[in-house]
A protein has these predicted regions:
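A conserved short beta-strand
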Residues: 165-175
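Short amphipathic alpha-helix adjacent to the substrate-entry channel of hydrolases
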Residues: 82-102
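Bacterial N-terminal signal peptides
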Residues: 10-18
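Gly/Ser-rich "nucleophile elbow"/oxyanion-hole loop immediately N-terminal to the catalytic nucleophile
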Residues: 66, 111-154, 162
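Active-site-adjacent alpha-helix of alpha/beta-hydrolase-fold enzymes
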Residues: 186-188, 193-255, 259, 263
Length: 294
């Protein structure tokens, strides 16, 4: 495979008080998980080119001593990587390798995006052995999760529905494009994130409807942000104002997503109580609908 040209490789230093090992030894609160994590983040774009998508960026925790699981994320309809880029930096700061990508066409539908997600998983696994890879020998190839926004979220569900054996968790946010679809074959823990006033993918026909079909996905969780629009879990600092979150809930959705990945990718059981124990009122008061099966 031909290598695409490198745009840049930088380290983004995250200022954290104390020694990193000390910070990660304790189970933080959901509120703390919602903030930037303890690891320094590096990212690069020198990745093998594949036919399923165009450009891609790999974020990873540069100073994490242990090996790490991987997360691949698809943007939504007529979106680019920049619309989900905050997830890459944020999740890497909490200890995960993350790939975001651009679809071949901005209007690619969910099945093509699902193919792209699967190809991205293969790429991330390949980085574990590729000469010149900055994460060579560091990726836990059997610990993969999929995420995505809008049609990318529907794609994450499609992949989980058809290829659950390839992943350990799925986190669709504001999934759209597959109205009233059935995802009963999903067999991995799935966190569904939605916005109460999503006008582009109304929850009763999309996210909430999808969640109700996840009869084989246990555990599963549905969190619907009160007053949230279609873009609540997307990057806030984008040029097109119409693609921005209408309220700032990054700490809320981020904290829940990190806890989900810590439990189901990393196998850290101490996070189970955070997710399925008594939820703090400062969390539940931000949700218009919250349900789970553990």
């Amino acid at each position: 495979m031909k290598l695409i040209s490198t745009i840049r490789f930088v380290f983004v230093c995250i200022v954290a008080s104390g020694f990193v090992g000390q910070l990660v030894a304790q189970t933080p609160s959901l509120e703390a998980l919602g903030r930037q994590g303890p690891y320094q983040v590096a990212w690069y774009t020198q990745l093998p080119s594949v036919p399923e998508f165009s450009g891609a960026t790999l974020y990873f925790p540069a100073n994490k001593a242990q090996d790490f699981g991987g997360v691949v994320i698809s943007p939504g309809f007529f979106e680019r990587q920049e619309n989900i880029s905050w997830w890459g930096n944020y999740l890497a700061s909490h200890g995960f390798a993350v790939i975001t990508f651009d679809t071949n066409e901005l209007n690619d539908l969910p099945p093509l995006r699902a193919d792209a997600l699967l190809a991205t998983i293969d790429m991330l696994r390949g980085e574990n052995s590729r000469q010149g890879s900055a994460v060579r020998g560091k990726i836990l190839e059997d610990s993969m999760a999929v995420m995505g926004h809008s049609m990318g979220g529907a794609a994450a569900l499609l992949l989980a529905n058809e290829n659950s054996s390839e992943i350990k968790a799925a986190i669709p946010f504001n999934a759209g494009g597959l109205r009233n679809a059935n995802f009963s074959a999903v067999a991995v823990p799935t966190l569904v994130i939605a916005g109460e006033i999503d006008r582009l993918a109304p929850v009763n026909e999309h996210a909430w409807s999808h969640y109700q079909t996840l009869t084989n996905a246990a555990p599963r969780m549905y969190m619907e942000v009160e007053g949230g629009n279609h873009f609540i879990a997307n990057t806030a600092e984008v040029e097109n104002e119409r693609l921005r979150p209408n309220i700032d809930v990054h700490e809320l959705v981020g904290g829940m997503a990190v806890a989900w990945l810590k439990l189901f990718l990393d196998g850290e059981e101490e996070y189970r109580e955070l997710l399925f124990g008594e939820m703090p009122s400062e969390i539940t008061e931000q949700l218009s609908r919250f349900e789970y099966q553990k």
